[in-house]
Amino acid sequence: MAIELDGVLGDTRPLWRDWLEDAARRFRSIAPLDPDALPADRGEAAAVLDRWAEAGVGDWRAALARFAEDRVPVYLRPSAEVSAALRALTAADCRLGVFTDAPEPLARVALAQLGADRRIEALEAGTGALDRLLERFGPETVVVRDPAALDLQSRS
C-alpha cells in the first residue's frame, strides 16, 4: 500500500512554508530567497533551493531538518484512527510505503512525530516519489490519499 503523507498521515505543507519564510529571513544577507517564487511542487522547489544554497547558504536540508525537529509538535499530532489503521494493516502483513513531494528530511521528521516511522517499510520523497514507490512495491499497489480510504483498507 502506498500512503500519501500529506493527505493521510499529516500535512507537512504549513511547516514547510514556515521554514521557507524563516530561511528567507535567516539567510537574506547571504542569498535572497523569495518563498512565493518557488514552485508549488516541493520536489521542484528543492532543485531551486539547491541552486540557492550554492550562493553560500550551505546545507539547506540540514537546516530544514533542525527547524522541523524543533517545531513539528506544533504542526502535527498523531491521529488515533490513523494509528489504529496502520497497526491493523501491519498486523495483516500489509507492506506499507509512504510518498510525498516534501524533501526527505521533513518527511522523516514528520513520520517520527506521527509514530508512523516504525510501521512503514519504505519512504519516497521529492519529485516522482509515488512512481518510485510503485516501482518498488509493484503496479498492483493500492494508493491511499485520504484517511477514510486508509480506514477502509484496514478493515478489508
Report residues per predicted region.
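Short glycine/proline-centered loop/turn elements that form peptide/ligand docking sites
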Residues: 57-58, 83-88, 151-152
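Asp-based, Mg2+/Mn2+-dependent phosphohydrolase catalytic module
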Residues: 104, 108-156
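Flexible, charged surface loops at secondary-structure boundaries
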Residues: 31-32, 90-91, 135-139
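Hydrophobic alpha-helix position signal
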Residues: 24, 49-52, 89, 111, ...
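Short, acidic loop-to-helix structural element flanking the phosphoryl-transfer center
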Residues: 70-98
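N-terminal helical cap/lid subdomain that shapes the substrate entry/recognition surface
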Residues: 1-80
